[in-house]
Amino acid sequence: MDTPLRRSRRLEGLKPLSPENLPVPEVSRAKRALVDFKSNSEETGELKSTRVPPLSLPSPGPQPETSPGSPCPPLSLPSPGPQPETSPGSPCPPLSLPSPGPQPETSPGSPCPPLSLPSPGPQPETSPGSPCPPLSLPSPGPQPEASPGSPGPRQDADDGSPQRQPEPHPGSLQPHQDLGLESPAGQTESSPESPQREQPSKLPPPQGELDSEAAHAKEEVIPGSPEPCPGQQAPGPEPSQPAQELTVQAPSSPERQLEPGKLPPAGETVTESLNLKKRVIASPQAPASKKLKEKEELPVIPKGKPKSGRVWKDRSKKRFSQMVQDKPLRTSWQRKMKERQERKLAKDFARHLEEEKQRRRQEKKERRAENLRRRLENERKAEIVQVIRNPAKLKKAKKKQLRSIEKRDTLALLQKQPPQRPVAKV
């Protein structure tokens, strides 16, 4: 698809046309119909030639169609900019600068191929009498046709000047072919006499050659191909041809020898295909990452209280055995003094209880001793005794009797009691 450009950018680098050079709509339609009619007759003739499958390289846009008279294959270079036009007498291939502008077409009799870069838009065509093929790669803009009789290569002066494709030249006998539908990378349609394959290259031409060609492009004006008005749309590409035309190739055409400076290295073609694959693969990964983020952002729905009433089954709550408050790291001074006083009172009370117990034990022991002493005294007072006043009697007493006689302190008794006769012991 061609990106719509602003009017200021479309008119950039274009020279004003005189009233006699302005295209007439009726004449343009007649020329376009003539080109379509002749291209259809030539394409039916191409089906009868020998078929050799061409080698296609990845190109995001439609590729050029090589007409039956071209002995050189199309070689495509990656250039998004406008391409130069090659006239019949041009001995050297024009080099293209990267520009979003149109691409060239090679008119009949042009001996050298135009070089263009990969473009998603329509690609240049090689008319029946052209001995050299166009070298094209995808370019985002439409392509102009080269007019017969131009003495040298032509190139647009402004790299970024987006020009519309002019009306088809009467000498150009084939319409644009849109080959983007046949293959995702795009394939070129080879003519019966072109055995070479197109080779994309990303190397731009030297700066000196670009400057010289830009100067030539400013001076040259094609008399046979009028440029369209700003509001006029360029003719669109024709629908792609069947796959049989892509394989047609003639054995009698000479091989195209490319200059070493313009040969694209094989590594760059592989790199271009890898880059295209990476772009295609990277696109579906972006929505996948967004889906993962959306899943992570989903809020966790908390569970309600269990029917059994056991609250520890809730993950946010703990069991009762775990609901013990830990001792805080710091306590207030008043609380600390209160706890110290309580500990002191508890210790004093324990000591008081111990002393009370010891005192009771001591008092009990003293009572026992006192009771024993009083009992012995009571027993002595209650004894029945006989006072022996005559000591000679004691001498006459036998030893057995003397054993039973105990000596007592009877002085107090004698003084308290009047002397009486002691009762003899039985």
Curated annotation (Swiss-Prot):
Coiled coil stretches, renumbered: 346-389
Induction (record text): By interleukin-3 (IL3).
Cellular-component GO terms for this entry: chromosome; nucleolus; nucleoplasm; nucleus
Keyword Phosphoprotein on entry: yes
Biased composition (Pro residues): 55-145
Location within or outside the cell: Nucleus; Chromosome; Nucleus, Nucleolus
Record has Nucleotidyltransferase as a keyword: no
In-chain residues carrying the UniProt-annotated modification Phosphothreonine: T66
Region described as Disordered: 1-426
Biased composition range(s): Basic and acidic residues: 33-49, 339-383
Its job: Required for proper chromosome segregation during mitosis and error-free mitotic progression.
Protein name as it appears in the record: Coiled-coil domain-containing protein 86
Natural source organism: Mus musculus
Gene, per the UniProt record: Ccdc86
